């Protein structure tokens, strides 16, 4: 549990980069993630006085960021389907990869983007942010059992989707 920081400025300095990274993975777009992060910190500023001394400030802030990210994803899904628009060249980690590996990464990215928003958020918090299930529960506003179920279902769906793609490729 993170102690409540002396100020929102301390909380921002401590967690901003991590939240932006989480939102980039959640949303797949840096500018959209920056906007959602800004919205999250604005909302955190408005609610900071209500943060209790025993509260897990990290999970509290990620809960606000998750809501901002999910709201942004809903707005985007109303406008367009983005999975086909992913440009791996824009990702620094994609430089120098073989065409086959790039296709694998693109398939993974598309499969993750197709997950229901809560499952995607739970998976990102667990796998990339290192959250425990109790922290995920706080961040998503649910129970620890619900957090476990969301991560489990996300992994199960990814395995089914990606396993099916591998079987199809093997038959070619």
Write out the residue ranges for each language-model feature:
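Short, Lys/Arg-enriched C-terminal cap helix and immediately downstream tail that follows
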Residues: 74, 115, 155-172
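A short, charge-rich alpha-helical start-of-domain segment used by transcription regulators
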Residues: 1-21, 31-37, 45
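Arg/Lys-rich amphipathic alpha helix in sigma70-family domain 2
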Residues: 52-53, 63-84, 101, 164-166
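Structural recognition of an alpha-helix C-terminal capping motif at a helix-to-coil junction
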Residues: 35-42, 55-67
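A short pre-motif secondary-structure segment
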Residues: 122-126
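Internal acidic/polar
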Residues: 2, 79-105, 109, 132
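Sigma70-family region 2
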Residues: 2, 39-56, 75-77, 161
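DNA-recognition helix of helix-turn-helix
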Residues: 66, 70, 140-164
């Amino acid at each position: 549990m993170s102690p409540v920081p002396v100020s929102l400025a301390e909380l921002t300095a401590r967690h901003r980069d991590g939240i932006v990274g989480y939102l980039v993975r959640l949303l797949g777009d840096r500018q959209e993630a920056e906007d959602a992060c800004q919205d999250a910190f604005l909302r955190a500023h408005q609610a900071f006085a209500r943060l209790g001394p025993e509260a897990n400030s990290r999970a509290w802030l990620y809960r606000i960021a998750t809501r901002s990210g999910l709201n942004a994803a809903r707005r985007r899904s109303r406008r367009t389907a983005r999975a086909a628009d992913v440009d791996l060249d824009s990702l620094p980690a994609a430089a120098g990869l073989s065409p086959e590996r790039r296709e694998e990464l693109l398939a993974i990215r598309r499969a993750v983007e197709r997950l229901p928003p809560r499952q995607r958020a739970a998976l990102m918090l667990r796998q990339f942010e290192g959250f425990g299930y109790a922290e995920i529960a706080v961040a998503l506003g649910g129970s620890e059992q619900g957090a476990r179920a969301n991560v489990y279902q996300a992994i199960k769906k990814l395995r089914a989707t990606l396993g099916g793609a591998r079987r199809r490729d093997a038959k070619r």
